[in-house]
Amino acid sequence: MKLIPESSGSHLSGTYLSAALEERHPGSFAFEFEDAVVEFLPADQVQKESMDSLTSVLEKLGAICGVSSSFTNLYDGNHAWFQASAALQNGLSQEDNSIIFYFQDYLLPQLLNSALAGRPSWVYYTEGLKRLKKHDDSSQVSYLHTLRVYLDNNLSVTKTAAALYLHRSTLLDRLSHITAMLGSDLRDPDYCLTLGIILRAELEQRRIEKIYLK
């Protein structure tokens, strides 16, 4: 687990937090690291610790935490640190009111954030996506949004039409234009996966940017 203060105004010393956690969890060890407190718990201790009891402890300590998956090798500690840190980062960026964030709950946001490697989404645009973007820049109808919803609904015309509140014939006409502009076959699963990752990663990138601009 990685623990940080719940707010900048509430801060207990890392030494105190570490001692309190080790007293609460026999067999664990905790220490300060990079302005946070890290705690390693034995697997059986993790299973005993319920969400409610951990929440109670964190509330008393004025802390929030990210929780990694279980590891059996102490040499995997760097992976556990990465997971706990990512859980905190993704959980806080979701504007969730929780104080416990589990890495397993944020796999998709983490994968999407990693997919772009810190670069703007347009860097990864295929030529077809560039054509759709050019269309959208001068139209009230977004082909990119339509394509993303279509991919999210596993190429189901019925579900996509319902999601976009469009008549089926209107959607089919729009998809015909989109497919022509893409210049590739949407029946190719690898191609669809590539487009889906780019468009979902772009959506996630925009969401995070809005949070930081507030």
Predicted regions mapped to residue ranges:
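Cytosolic nucleotide-utilizing catalytic cores of signal-transduction proteins
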Residues: 1-214
